[in-house]
Swiss-Prot record:
Native organism taxonomy: Bacteria, Pseudomonadati, Pseudomonadota, Gammaproteobacteria, Pseudomonadales
Sections of the chain in a coiled coil: none
UniProt entry tagged with the keyword Repeat: no
Role, per record: Probable electron transporter.
Residues in Flavodoxin-like domain copies: 3-145
Named cofactor requirement(s): FMN
Keyword terms of this UniProt record: Electron transport, Flavoprotein, FMN, Transport
Species: Pseudomonas aeruginosa (strain ATCC 15692 / DSM 22644 / CIP 104116 / JCM 14847 / LMG 12228 / 1C / PRS 101 / PAO1)
Cited InterPro entries: Flavdoxin-like, Flavodoxin/NO_synth, Flavoprotein-like_sf
Protein's UniProt name: Uncharacterized protein PA3435
Amino acid sequence: MKVAILSGSVYGTAEEVARHAQKLLSAAGLEASHLPRASLDELKAFAPEAFLVVTSTTGMGELPDNLQPLYYAIRDQLPAWHGLPGGVIGLGDSSYGDTFCGGGEQVRELFGELGVREVLPMLRLDASETVTPETDAEPWLAEFAAALKG
């Protein structure tokens, strides 16, 4: 199964988690490809059969600048990905209250618009509680891989 891993990052942490996810999903036998800063055309050319989006949150609960162009292109064009499996790893800081993991929530809303089905609840990684988000994501990623392999 071809898994497109998309990431949005401000300081690079989400990119690190996405790269680690690619290694783990590939080791689990999936064809995982991290596509940072991909255009919609590049993403369509990859022909994903599943999605993993790893994103941090910036500002007042927004997506990072490097993920916004793809996010808005997908929202505008709504590709035919209905029924494909997906998952979201949201990074944030719970001290920001209501906007904690807001970037991930925006991706979840987009999944809903596209009909992408979340195979697991969003993983929320809290910067105020962890210094090893890649390691903290491993149990969730193992469960995600198992769900994709069915």
